[in-house]
A protein has these predicted regions:
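Non-heme Fe(II)/2-oxoglutarate
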Residues: 1-62, 77
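Catalytic core of non-heme Fe(II) oxygenases with the double-stranded beta-helix
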Residues: 60-177
């Protein structure tokens, strides 16, 4: 995964305006998403410059999927999963806004254990889980940043205890060859 600044502040505010214009769709469960407000922009809205900046970043991937907003509020979370659909090649999560009182809601990844050698001065019990996804990682994001990853990343979102966290999810197809 990597963190990038894909959109500028004006585009971020444009995305917030689009989100606020959309009807709230409260989901108790939407596959891996729990207790979120999910909103889909129209095809016309998806043609705005704020979306085009993200689409341009992913221009080497098939433009087969749409964007959607997720607002994480109290008790919201996303369970650990991979986007293992064969058609999904790239995911971009853009952090649009958060409340000042936000507790929880962190982007999470489960990374592979990569240490090949074991220190001689430390004891061990059990086999080394080399290349297994066993390392939990909190991905600290700033408002305006985008988290970019492919379908192999095991990821989730920590449960929100207080406040809210608003993101734009952008899915793209496989790399254009």
């Amino acid at each position: 995964y990597k963190l990038e600044n894909i959109i500028n502040e004006e585009q971020r505010h444009q995305l917030l305006d689009v989100y606020n214009s959309l009807k709230s769709e409260l989901a108790h469960q939407d596959y891996n998403l729990f207790d979120v407000d999910k909103r889909h922009p129209s095809k016309e809205q998806a043609q705005l410059d704020c979306f085009k900046a993200i689409d341009q970043y992913a221009s080497n991937h098939e433009q087969t999927f749409r964007h959607y907003f997720l607002n994480y509020t109290e008790d919201s979370f996303t369970k650990f999963h991979t986007d293992n659909d064969d058609a999904v090649g790239l995911t971009i999560v853009t952090f649009l806004d958060r409340s000042d009182n936000l507790i929880g809601g962190e982007a999470l990844a489960m990374l592979p254990y990569t240490k090949r050698s074991r220190p001689a001065n430390k004891y061990r019990k059990g086999e080394a889980p080399i290349d297994e996804r066993v390392v939990p990682k909190v991905i600290n994001m700033e408002v305006g940043q985008s988290l970019i990853y492919d379908k192999s990343l095991m990821h989730g979102v920590g449960q929100v205890e207080r406040g809210n966290r608003l993101v734009l999810i952008s899915w793209y197809g496989n790399t254009i060859s």
